[in-house]
Amino acid sequence: MHIWQEYFSTSFTGAPAGFLSAAHLLQLGIGYLCATLLAVTLGRSRRHRTEQEKRLVLRYAAVFQLFFAALKIAADCIDAGSPAPMLLSMPFYLCSIMFVALPLAAFGKSRVARVMTDFVAIFGVLAAVAGAAGAAYIYKIYPALHIHTLECLLTHVASGFAALYIWISHLATFRREDVPITAGVLGAFMILAVLSNALLASTPYPTNYMFFSRSDGTPFLLFEKLFGAQSILYALSTALAMWLWWGVAGALCSRLSHRADHAQTSPSPYRQQE
């Protein structure tokens, strides 16, 4: 019972870790270091493997991510004695879209896998940085060693790992015909977030999906200070920031990917001399 109370329930007795505290920064440092080393090592070693072999790594990352997400949801439901907390855990945040995008990139077929791979490459690092480093709400409430803080860290870092691995292994394609689809995926989840926030606003479980109602210590805090929480200008600014990231990061990823492909297919000048 002690283990359950301290590490899984909301009736813990430990002190909150604190946002950007030593414990928070230590967890971030270890998580980012491990994810980066793994992504670089596996990405370089599998760069010239088949697409199927490259996607095997994404499958492990997807299972890892979903395991901890499911564990946290299960703990919340058991603690509440009700499945109602699941309403707060739908994948309608920019970072938790990865709970859908990463498995589809890993296990999907043909164009679905290709488009979702591009999506993860664009948004994975943003999820890792903004979601784990900017998780003020989580670390202000829960101890460093709690399912909520650990799930937040591990699932976000897994997204960053997946994005780095995709870049390094040259798994993404960034085809022009897929651009409208990646934009459509983001737009669809935004619509779902707005609908969910509106439908659950007057219930005991009001949601703040996509942080459209208020910030959570993420970079959107600047918009909240400028326009105020629950305002239309705040919500629009938050949405525009996501679209801006999609445009800038997508263009950069596409350029780097095409440059890498060109370098691989260009003949060596030394061979030409021979």
Placement of each model-derived feature along the sequence:
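Hydrophobic core of alpha-helical transmembrane segments in multi-pass integral membrane proteins
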Residues: 27-45, 64-71, 187-194, 239-251
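Membrane-proximal helix-loop-helix units in multi-pass membrane proteins
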Residues: 104-162
